[in-house]
């Protein structure tokens, strides 16, 4: 993987705009609904998006658009099959390097002991590329309808001296896939959703494809490992803090991993892009900060949430600016819109 290939080091924002998730002024339970897109993937033919908020009746948190219609205001195509509606708080897509499978993870950030009420927050879906109408739930055993076994592995891998046994609270915001491994990116960990530390930690697990007749299933191994614990402030103390992981992707074009880190403080949004070779990630080396063409850190004035390679040259970044009315040029974000950026990489 990627030995000897020079890494991209710089990028330029070549296009920015707003995309629509639903009609303007859409409401749910009497409140105005905001488009809070947290995940994007280009599957080779179209873009798939996922929102980290539930959608109103008749719509879905997961939807698709053609790349050429990215900035179009027309209604997107909603994915309405039950598994998409049953899961909540989507955070990141991944695509296998051979392009055969797409995966989509939730945050794994809450569980209700003795109840199935919150199982939807602990769900990892996958499907054959182009067949998103038939998603499977990735489980550690065939008996469950959610991915709770995955949550248990993540919680025990994150255990430390303060929280031995299991990390009580954590939030997954990154998911990446190589030919034989999945990578989970951790943004938050701690005692609870109101008492946590921002992190950029990465956990790996091996997988294989099992074929039965014309069915293909992803099966996980039992070799869960915490492979990286990156602190952006240590490598770049001049950047705002606390920056934490908001996306992790493997790029088959450059055989590297991309990392997005973001922060939101007092309505002020910042994000930065980083890159690393696989062999450096596996040995917990620091990521390299991507600069602009004049060598300064490439700064995005948004809460960049996910990215996807479009081709050898371009990355598409999607921003979940929560309810902040960010601007692009003279345009201001409306509640049904999410900002995006296309970067050309050098």
Question: PLM ranges: what are they?
Answer:
Residues 2-346:
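Sequence/structural signature of beta-propeller domains
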